[in-house]
Amino acid sequence: MKQYQDLIKDIFENGYETDDRTGTGTIALFGSKLRWDLTKGFPAVTTKKLAWKACIAELIWFLSGSTNVNDLRLIQHDSLIQGKTVWDENYENQAKDLGYHSGELGPIYGKQWRDFGGVDQIIEVIDRIKKLPNDRRQIVSAWNPAELKYMALPPCHMFYQFNVRNGYLDLQWYQRSVDVFLGLPFNIASYATLVHIVAKMCNLIPGDLIFSGGNTHIYMNHVEQCKEILRREPKELCELVISGLPYKFRYLSTKEQLKYVLKLRPKDFVLNNYVSHPPIKGKMAV
């Protein structure tokens, strides 16, 4: 994952210091791009340990359409009350400030992916890939201007587009706001996993993964952590293996396939030969 280190280096060398919504301060670049060939391995960050279980739990939670942090907790920890999630701080701060309770976060990612004005974008985009693979409208958007003010956190990764290329499935996502230290490794692994899942559903091969970033930043309280990442040597890429799906999976309807996907848990997603440097802790800016 040398690309990740190169981005950090670029921000340090060419970024500008600025204030931000959280009051933490950042070093930022506007407009960044990274690309991975998924046929060469899975792009899990290796210069620090990836929070893999949390990453997969969040993706399944998004795909389920849930917007309640306790549902995420159940997927990740098999408990509605025990264990932390990456959305807890957003719930305790922004969601409660909006008047939400009992774990509700408002119409965030899951709501938009599965019910954007009544449209189930996940079902529609996968059906479109199957029926019209050369179509250029294979897009899912989480950015719903009419509902932004009701969200605990407006979507950072706003929309993504699939592309079918000679039997390979590519995905490009656009992210308006990129927390390079904490968020980006999570996002890379999540969208790479989504490519693998949808490729299985559509009988395609995972192809290219492309990240396009808007305000791409390192928070001031993550500067030393990012410098440590630059001192570490990246390890080899690993391989993603997904289990728990039936043999007949590829022959099912999209709706039936998705039912099986939503029954999967983090233990069903294994990174073979994943070797990383030790974790590096950092506080999330909320």
From Swiss-Prot:
Reaction(s) the record says it catalyses: dUMP + (6R)-5,10-methylene-5,6,7,8-tetrahydrofolate = 7,8-dihydrofolate + dTMP
Binding site for (6R)-5,10-methylene-5,6,7,8-tetrahydrofolate: 179, 285
Pfam family of the protein (one): Thymidylat_synt
Single GO MF descriptor: thymidylate synthase activity
EC number per UniProt: 2.1.1.45
Pathway linked to the protein: Pyrimidine metabolism; dTTP biosynthesis
Keywords: Methyltransferase, Nucleotide biosynthesis, Transferase
Domain of life the protein comes from: Viruses
InterPro entries: Thymidate_synth/dCMP_Mease (IPR045097), Thymidate_synth/dCMP_Mease_dom (IPR023451), Thymidate_synth/dCMP_Mease_sf (IPR036926), Thymidylate_synthase (IPR000398), Thymidylate_synthase_AS (IPR020940)
Group of enzyme by EC: transferase
Catalytic residue list: 156 (nucleophile)
Residues annotated to bind dUMP: 21, 136-137, 176-179, 187, 217-219
GO terms (BP aspect): dTMP biosynthetic process; dTTP biosynthetic process; methylation
Protein family (similarity comment): Belongs to the thymidylate synthase family.
Additional notes on this entry: This enzyme is also expressed by the thyA gene of E.coli; the phage and host synthases exhibit striking dissimilarities in both structure and function.
Record note on quaternary structure: Homodimer.
Protein name: Thymidylate synthase
Species this chain originates from: Enterobacteria phage T4 (Bacteriophage T4)
Lineage, top ranks: Viruses, Duplodnaviria, Heunggongvirae, Uroviricota, Caudoviricetes
Gene: TD
